[in-house]
Amino acid sequence: MATPSLPAGAVFRVSRGNFDPARFAEVDQMTRDTGSYLIPAIRQLDGLIGYYAGTSEEGSTVHVSLWRSHEDAQQMSRLKEMIVDARGASEAVGVSFIPIVNYPIAWII
């Protein structure tokens, strides 16, 4: 398997939230529904390499994205569809978020 090539300075951004596992169906549906407006908005941002979102029955939801640089990743902290619309939808179904972190990439396979 070939090792992927990433630009120097690439980072991945992790946004994670927790919720009552009894609300899994609601949170999972909300995650899918918010994709209808998050995907087109995020695709417009410079520096996006990849984006993944998922929800676990164990009471956790996560968004992991890969960016060319820390500055590119920081666009997410200003994206209305994320910080207003999706956050409101998430909180409405009981999701509480932990601080978002951008991680410089140490190694890849």
Where are these regions (language model features)?
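Short S/T/G/P-rich N-terminal loop/turn motif that feeds into the first structured element of a domain
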Residues: 1-61, 68-81, 88-109
